[in-house]
Amino acid sequence: MGILGLSKLLYDKSPNAIREQELKNFFGRRIAIDASMSIYQFIIAMKGFQDGQGLELTNEKGDVTSHLNGLFARTLRMIDEGIKPIYVFDGKPPKLKADELEMRRQKAAEAEREFEKAKDAGDDEMMEKMSKRTVRVSRDQIDESKKLLRLMGIPVIQAPSEAEAQCAELVKKGKAWAVGTEDMDALTFGSTVMLRHLNISDAKKRPIAEIHLDEVLQITGLSMGQFVDLCILLGCDYVPKVPGIGPQKAWEGIQRYGSIESFLESLDTTKHPVPADFYYKEARAFFQNPEVTPAEEINIQFSEPDEVGLIQFLVKEKLFNPDRVNKGIARLRAALTRKTQGRLDSFFTVTKVPQQTAAARAPLAGTKRPRDGKYVHVSGTLRKATSGHKKAVKK
């Protein structure tokens, strides 16, 4: 879930902290990517629906390959633009997340039931909608994704707990420039720069949102501690929401009272009963001191692609088109041997111009704002595969 409604709130309260960018603008940047989120997006993007059946991208043996197709293609696309991706995988979820995970399981089970009802009613639109809500990334898909990335020579990091927290640790310690994810809690964990919509296909023409935490804090006048409290009130993965407290009430509460403690004291609990398991202090502590591997202990290294290994895995085992794989290997080698061109901003010291506070700045009239959402669906259509892979009915 990330942080419920935070994206829209930031567009409302601190639009100047968010820049719209193209992929090519991140040339030379190391980006720590939330791997599980990316793989989920690839699976959703390549999932179709026809004649009352869910369709998945498979090879001739019937193996689902949507995660590998998406990961291979998008990683190559980033490499072509001079970006250095670092994929970070989730570890064991914290105990605070147990209720959220159980809720997700219940929602998936409910989606399965709604799918069957829609099937009986012949409602194809509802069937397709419910089918996508049941998508989960399997352990095998995670393991295969790690294998592919390592064969490509791309760094893979296993987080001890939350991937977004580990990504933020890399950014805070200078091992990466930004976190690439759809989950807004990368900012809550302290990442100084966050990129959303990084995995959207170029055909969609949706800009990448580059969000700067320091500018969010400067414009809103919030301290980092107050920002964390705001995120908890908005709704996060670790505690339930307080009933009736939406984005505007949460914003006004932190602006006026400065902390969750003081805000709760002001609440009319007959209208806003605080859940017994609203363990906000524990959630706050986790955001401020999550379980991560210290960045100093992580050796990030980009290496030569394993040509033999890639052909064995993708062509012989997964039945990818040999030409496509060989061209991909050539692109990886070209990226390593390409004469490195430094970013222009690395030659200068940049002094930031102080910005006005939100109260002093006039509202931006007529500004179009992207919709807020939990996940971004990378593609809405399935094209005929040219790599020996096809849409197959999910069994």
From Swiss-Prot:
Subunit structure: Interacts with PCNA. Three molecules of FEN1 bind to one PCNA trimer with each molecule binding to one PCNA monomer. PCNA stimulates the nuclease activity without altering cleavage specificity.
Cofactor binding notes: Binds 2 magnesium ions per subunit. They probably participate in the reaction catalyzed by the enzyme. May bind an additional third magnesium ion after substrate binding.
Positions that bind Mg(2+) 1: D34, D90, E162, E164
Documented EC number(s): 3.1.-.-
Protein name as annotated: Flap endonuclease 1
CDD domains, A to Z: H3TH_FEN1-Euk, PIN_FEN1
Transmembrane segments: none
